[in-house]
């Protein structure tokens, strides 16, 4: 029954996670996508999920996941908080990277709601910008959506609203600077057919810049933007 539910979520266009069973385990290089391995230490990940079907046919998927490994941080010279000449942060380039997360997805039939929250530790530039250490991180998102089924010209239309926050090191950037993200998105996804879809989103965003240059790097940026996919 579980595998049939996972398959049905994908086949019906509800964006299920796929028919991978209730328990999964993986090993990967840990240096993020399209990056060569730099320390020969593999990340290990485990995930468990279960799709519960209510009497009315609506499905609620709940799950947990966790990973750990050693992440190799790249470094570049940066001006310390106290000012002066730019220096390369101290600390080992290889820092333990570990996270645990819990999530749920109430699939839109027609109303839906999903959320995820993550906690962990990973590399992060210190507040004085003189060293890179293992520090706490946390964040998550919540999204509400509606599934409108088309009779002509499309399969489904999904209007949605999403809010997300993250506080922690941005490990894939040089020096792993502390990253603060607060973002509200309004969007709509239009599925022409099973092979073609168009998504438009408008975001109100507050994010930390990755720019390490200048006397006052890693500034928080505020703005609004529109995205198409």
What are these regions (language model features)?
Residues 1-65:
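Aromatic- and glycine-enriched pocket-lining scaffold segments that form the walls
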Residues 56-229:
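Outer-membrane beta-barrel pore domains
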């Amino acid at each position: 029954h579980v595998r049939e539910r996972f398959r049905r979520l994908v086949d019906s266009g509800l964006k299920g996670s796929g028919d991978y069973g209730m328990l999964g385990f993986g090993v990967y290089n840990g240096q993020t996508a399209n990056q060569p391995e730099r320390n020969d230490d593999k990340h290990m990940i485990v995930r468990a999920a279960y799709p519960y079907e209510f009497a009315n046919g609506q499905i609620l998927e709940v799950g947990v996941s966790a990973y750990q490994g050693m992440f190799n941080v790249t470094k570049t010279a940066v001006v310390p908080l106290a000012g002066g000449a730019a220096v390369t942060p101290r600390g080992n380039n290889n820092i333990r990277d570990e996270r645990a997360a819990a999530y749920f997805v109430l699939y839109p039939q027609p109303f839906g709601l999903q959320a995820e929250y993550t906690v962990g530790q990973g590399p992060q530039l210190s507040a004085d910008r003189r060293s890179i250490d293992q520090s706490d991180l946390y964040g998550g998102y919540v999204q509400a959506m509606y599934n409108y089924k088309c009779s002509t010209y499309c399969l489904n239309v999904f209007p949605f609203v999403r809010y997300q926050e993250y506080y922690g090191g941005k490990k894939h950037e040089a020096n792993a600077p502390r990253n603060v993200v607060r973002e509200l998105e309004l969007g709509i996804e239009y599925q022409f057919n099973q092979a073609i879809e168009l998504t438009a989103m408008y975001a109100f965003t507050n994010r930390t810049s990755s720019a390490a240059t200048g006397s006052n790097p890693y500034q928080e940026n505020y703005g609004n933007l529109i995205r198409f996919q």
